[in-house]
Amino acid sequence: MNTVNYLRISLVDRCNFRCSYCMPTGEAIAYLHRSQILSYEELLFLVGEVFLPLGIDRFRLTGGEPLLRRGVVGFVRALVGLPGVADVSLSTNAYLLEELAEDLYAAGLRRVNISLDSLDPGVFARITGRDHWSKVWAGIQAAHRVGFDPLKLNVVVLPGINEQEVPDLAALTIDRQWHVRFIEFMPIGNTGYFEQAGWVNSETLRSRIRERFGLGEGACYGNGPADVFQIPGAKGTVGFISQMSECFCSRCNRVRLAADGFLRPCLLNEADQIDLKTPLRAGAGAAQLRELVSELLLRKPEINFRERDRGTTGSYGRTMSQIGG
C-alpha cells in the first residue's frame, strides 16, 4: 500500500450543473448551510497543523463546484503559500473559469482538471442539465491560454449517450498538450441511473481509439488512478480511470475531506469516515486531531482492500457532488 500523501478537499457541496451521473435525477438536494461548512481558516489550520505534519502535502480542491465559493482565489493563494505544501490542483466544470483563470494562476495554481463529457452542445446539455457548452469551452480555452499545465479533461463515459464521442474527444490530445481521461461510470451519486444505463469498460474505449488512431503502450505514472496512453505523434495523452473493471486500490494514496469536515478514507467507504469539524470546533488541539487522522490512515489499507472485495455494491448516503468526486 502506498503512503498517503494526497488530500482532496471539497470546498462546497453546491454545483451550478446537475450532471446525471453525479446527482439523483428529479430529487431535491439538501445542501449544507454555510455554518455547516468548514471555513477557510479552519481548512488552513487542518492543512498546516494536521495534514502536513502527517506527510500529506498534495491537495486537490473539489466541490460540488469549488469556484462557486466566494473567496476561492484568496484561499488558493493562502494554501499554496503554506510552508511544506508540494502541490495544489483544482477540479472544476469550467463555467466560471474564463473569468477566474488569470487570477487563479496568479495565486499560484498551476494544474486544473476540467469536466467535459461531450463535444456536442446538445449531448452536453442532456448530461449536465445545463445549456452551457460554449461557456465551458471558453473556460477551457482560457485555462490553456493562461498556461495551466497539465490541463486535464475528464470524461465520464455513459452508454448510448456520449460513448460514440470517445475517439473525437481523444483527438483533442493530438495537436494540444492536453490530457483527456475517460472515467468508467460508477454507482455513486445516481444509483438508479447506473442500474438503468450500465457502464462501458476502458478496454472497449481503448479499442475504439486504437482502431481510428493507433495507441501506444500504457503506463501508470506516480500514484494516480489513470492508466496513460498516447496516440502516435500526439502532443498530449489519453488516460483511463477504470474503477469498475481494473482495480487500482493497491496504488491509492489519497483521502477525501468533505465540505462539512468528514474525512473519508475511500470513495466507496462511508462507514469508516471520521468527523473532524466537531472536535475542531469544540476546541481540540492539533495533536488530538492528528491522532484521529493517524488512526484512520493506519486502517486505510484494510479499508481499501475490504472495499475492493465488496465492489461498488453498497448503498451510499452521499452523492458524488457531496463527497468531492
From Swiss-Prot:
<keyword id="KW-0949">S-adenosyl-L-methionine</keyword>
<comment type="pathway">
    <text>Cofactor biosynthesis; molybdopterin biosynthesis.</text>
</comment>
<feature type="domain" description="Radical SAM core">
    <location>
        <begin position="1"/>
        <end position="226"/>
    </location>
</feature>
<dbReference type="Pfam" id="PF04055">
    <property type="entry name" value="Radical_SAM"/>
</dbReference>
<dbReference type="GO" id="GO:0046872">
    <property type="term" value="F:metal ion binding"/>
</dbReference>
<dbReference type="InterPro" id="IPR013483">
    <property type="entry name" value="MoaA"/>
</dbReference>
<feature type="binding site">
    <location>
        <position position="15"/>
    </location>
    <ligand>
        <name>[4Fe-4S] cluster 1</name>
    </ligand>
</feature>
<keyword id="KW-0456">Lyase</keyword>
<feature type="binding site">
    <location>
        <position position="152"/>
    </location>
    <ligand>
        <name>GTP</name>
    </ligand>
</feature>
<dbReference type="InterPro" id="IPR013785">
    <property type="entry name" value="Aldolase_TIM"/>
</dbReference>
<dbReference type="GO" id="GO:0061798">
    <property type="term" value="F:GTP 3',8'-cyclase activity"/>
</dbReference>
<keyword id="KW-0004">4Fe-4S</keyword>
<feature type="binding site">
    <location>
        <position position="60"/>
    </location>
    <ligand>
        <name>GTP</name>
    </ligand>
</feature>
<protein>
    <recommendedName>
        <fullName>GTP 3',8-cyclase</fullName>
        <ecNumber>4.1.99.22</ecNumber>
    </recommendedName>
</protein>
<comment type="function">
    <text>Catalyzes the cyclization of GTP to (8S)-3',8-cyclo-7,8-dihydroguanosine 5'-triphosphate.</text>
</comment>
<dbReference type="Pfam" id="PF06463">
    <property type="entry name" value="Mob_synth_C"/>
</dbReference>
<dbReference type="GO" id="GO:0006777">
    <property type="term" value="P:Mo-molybdopterin cofactor biosynthetic process"/>
</dbReference>
<feature type="binding site">
    <location>
        <position position="115"/>
    </location>
    <ligand>
        <name>S-adenosyl-L-methionine</name>
    </ligand>
</feature>
<feature type="binding site">
    <location>
        <position position="249"/>
    </location>
    <ligand>
        <name>[4Fe-4S] cluster 2</name>
    </ligand>
</feature>
<comment type="similarity">
    <text>Belongs to the radical SAM superfamily. MoaA family.</text>
</comment>
<feature type="binding site">
    <location>
        <position position="21"/>
    </location>
    <ligand>
        <name>S-adenosyl-L-methionine</name>
    </ligand>
</feature>
<dbReference type="InterPro" id="IPR050105">
    <property type="entry name" value="MoCo_biosynth_MoaA/MoaC"/>
</dbReference>
<feature type="binding site">
    <location>
        <position position="252"/>
    </location>
    <ligand>
        <name>[4Fe-4S] cluster 2</name>
    </ligand>
</feature>
<feature type="binding site">
    <location>
        <position position="91"/>
    </location>
    <ligand>
        <name>GTP</name>
    </ligand>
</feature>
<keyword id="KW-0408">Iron</keyword>
<dbReference type="GO" id="GO:0005525">
    <property type="term" value="F:GTP binding"/>
</dbReference>
<keyword id="KW-0479">Metal-binding</keyword>
<dbReference type="InterPro" id="IPR010505">
    <property type="entry name" value="MoaA_twitch"/>
</dbReference>
<keyword id="KW-0547">Nucleotide-binding</keyword>
<feature type="binding site">
    <location>
        <begin position="254"/>
        <end position="256"/>
    </location>
    <ligand>
        <name>GTP</name>
    </ligand>
</feature>
<dbReference type="InterPro" id="IPR000385">
    <property type="entry name" value="MoaA_NifB_PqqE_Fe-S-bd_CS"/>
</dbReference>
<dbReference type="InterPro" id="IPR007197">
    <property type="entry name" value="rSAM"/>
</dbReference>
<feature type="binding site">
    <location>
        <position position="22"/>
    </location>
    <ligand>
        <name>[4Fe-4S] cluster 1</name>
    </ligand>
</feature>
<comment type="subunit">
    <text>Monomer and homodimer.</text>
</comment>
<dbReference type="GO" id="GO:1904047">
    <property type="term" value="F:S-adenosyl-L-methionine binding"/>
</dbReference>
<dbReference type="InterPro" id="IPR006638">
    <property type="entry name" value="Elp3/MiaA/NifB-like_rSAM"/>
</dbReference>
<feature type="binding site">
    <location>
        <position position="64"/>
    </location>
    <ligand>
        <name>S-adenosyl-L-methionine</name>
    </ligand>
</feature>
<feature type="binding site">
    <location>
        <position position="186"/>
    </location>
    <ligand>
        <name>S-adenosyl-L-methionine</name>
    </ligand>
</feature>
<dbReference type="GO" id="GO:0051539">
    <property type="term" value="F:4 iron, 4 sulfur cluster binding"/>
</dbReference>
<keyword id="KW-0501">Molybdenum cofactor biosynthesis</keyword>
<keyword id="KW-0342">GTP-binding</keyword>
<keyword id="KW-0411">Iron-sulfur</keyword>
